Amino acid sequence: MSQLEEFYRGKKVLITGHTGFKGAWMCKVLLELGAVVSGYALNPPTNPNLFELCKLKERIHSHEGDIRDLDRLKEIFAMEQPEIVIHMAAQPLVRESYKEPVYTYDVNVMGTVNVLECVRLTDSVKSFVNVTTDKVYRNFEWERGYKEDDILNGFDPYSNSKSCSELVTSSYKNSFFGGESGKMDSGRFVAISTVRAGNVLGGGDFATDRIIPDCIRAVSASKPIVVRNPYSTRPYQHVLEPVCAYLTVAMEQLKDITKAGNYNIGPADEDCLNTGELVNLFCEKWNAIRPNEAVREDKPDGGPHEAGLLKLDSTKIRETFGIKGKWNMDEVMERIVEWNVSYLSGEDVNPVTEKQIREYIQKP
């Protein structure tokens, strides 16, 4: 039995944003670990979606609600009495943030305020993790990876709202949770961290403006894969890498509050591919199973500003918790193709999802 399994068995964990792509993977992992899972979110953001495909509503305490509704959120915290809270609810898309900046700030900033307020008012909570993004940093197009103490100042409304979410967390931590000590005036201890992950990939992502879902949609419609920014470099990683890292941070800081802090979660340098390389790898793996279906076509669309080069330095989380990437990009893409071939064949996706979770957890 892994450390995560020993720790999470029977633990009450509340996830905000549990109906999203990453949230649904988080639910599946926690169920595999034996946790008691509750979630608070709007309806799933896409149709189809992983949450419904895995029939998660039947397996967890799922509560529908807007993260901006503080009174409703307080009710759910009081009802569920969680020990651990993972805050993932967000408006997560850069391009959408240009269309809906006010909504993006409202969800990503005030949503964080509301969750932290509920953590403050709920005595059962001992560990809180705020999931932000690699895009919280002011982007200088550096070759080196960004470190946790670099300037927080995202460019676009999405990235900047997540920078603000980091600052909100820091303020609450210092104002109400005793700063680094984690000791509140009441004597209660709460460990608080933020985690900044790179771009996640995996089966069950059906979002717009994401490269792998675009690839799947293209091949299933017998169309070429249109690549709008082939030379933009991102810290791509399988969704299970950050999900299990979040759970490790939540576990370890509860055991030892001095480990609470801010952490980057990104892949090794050799796995920081540009979008063109990522699509080429997808085509190679897909065509190995379904020959000649995947074809790439570059077509810049003159869309709004997005960073060209973005890497994370994950030294801190590796040295603090021993966390390092388990799957290289070859292994990641093989599992994405495996999952989507199963899905497009009309199979129940629970077995392939659970198989991949077990493979990941059991790998040293």
Which positions does each model-derived feature cover?
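Histidine kinase transmitter module recognition
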Residues: G65, G203-G204, K324
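Glycine-/small-residue-rich active-site loops that bind phosphorylated ligands and cofactors
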Residues: R68, L93, T104, G202, ...
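Residue-level recognition of oxygen-bearing side chains
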Residues: V13, R72, Y103, M110, ...
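A generic short alpha-helical patch detector that favors 3-5-residue windows
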Residues: V85, A207, H305-L309
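C-terminal substrate-binding subdomain of Rossmann-fold SDR/epimerase-dehydratase oxidoreductases
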Residues: E32-A35, N199, V219-P364
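N-terminal Rossmann-like NAD(P)+-binding domain of SDR-like oxidoreductases, especially those catalyzing
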Residues: M1-A197, Y360
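NAD(P)-dependent short-chain dehydrogenase/reductase
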Residues: F140-G145, D149, P157-Y158, S163-L254, ...
